[in-house]
Amino acid sequence: MPSMTDSTAIALLSGGLDSATAAALAQEAGCRVIGLSFDYGQRHRRELQAAAAIAEALNLAEHHTISVNLASWGGSSLTDSAQALPVDGVQDGVIPSTYVPGRNTVFISIGLSLAEARGADRLVLGVNAVDYSGYPDCRPDYLDAFQTLADLSSKVGREGRGPRLWAPLVEWSKQKIVEEALRLGVPIERSWSCYSGGDHPCGVCDSCRIRDAALQAAGRPDLCSSASR
């Protein structure tokens, strides 16, 4: 774990387990963490409520929510309620319908803008190995390419002091993420990973299944969705 004492980090905070764990890791490393969430036209607001709850629980220095309506042109089952959400499991080599065109590129760009404005040293991302199997914008080669773009496209980058993209979970299994979240005291019960809204996770979408399997493996079935207990 790199030492980041006295550093400022911008943490993209979706409301899910992964981004919450990444933010907590940045805090443990000594960072002053600013949370950044996005209302991008997703099917429900439950994850934004979770992001606010996590920011409060982790006592983040600041938390901002930015509106970027990616639902205007659709292209994803996460922004278009007419499309069915996937429930058949993650398939190798297949980009699922929950991929939102350009989402991470938009989010990271805005995060870098905030980082440069605030003099932040890091941009913390919760992408991980599970996402690698599906989403093109959660892979190590994408992150490497974006770091190059960030260095070339900003004043601080050209001056050799641009913020570093930090994705500590990128090669972790979901079980390891859960175990680290438990160790760090991340409020898992306040996080939201389900593709659907409502008062309780559906337990059948791909995201719920991956999360529940990891919680079971980590010995915390009590935190699983009620459908899988």
From Swiss-Prot:
Binds 1 zinc ion per subunit. Its cofactor is Zn(2+). It catalyses: 7-carboxy-7-deazaguanine + NH4(+) + ATP = 7-cyano-7-deazaguanine + ADP + phosphate + H2O + H(+). The keyword Cytoplasm does not apply. ATP binds at L13, S14, G15, G16, L17, D18, S19, A20, T21, A22, A23. It is an enzyme of class 6 (ligase). Keywords: ATP-binding, Ligase, Metal-binding, Nucleotide-binding, Queuosine biosynthesis, Zinc. Zn(2+) binds at C194, C202, C205, C208. InterPro entries: QueC, Rossmann-like_a/b/a_fold. Pathway: Purine metabolism; 7-cyano-7-deazaguanine biosynthesis. One of its GO terms (molecular function) is zinc ion binding. It comes from the Bacteria. GO terms for biological process: queuosine biosynthetic process. Its EC number is 6.3.4.20. Pfam families: QueC (PF06508). Belongs to the QueC family. Catalyzes the ATP-dependent conversion of 7-carboxy-7-deazaguanine (CDG) to 7-cyano-7-deazaguanine (preQ(0)). This is 7-cyano-7-deazaguanine synthase. It comes from Synechococcus sp. (strain WH7803). The lineage of its organism: Bacteria, Bacillati, Cyanobacteriota, Cyanophyceae, Synechococcales.
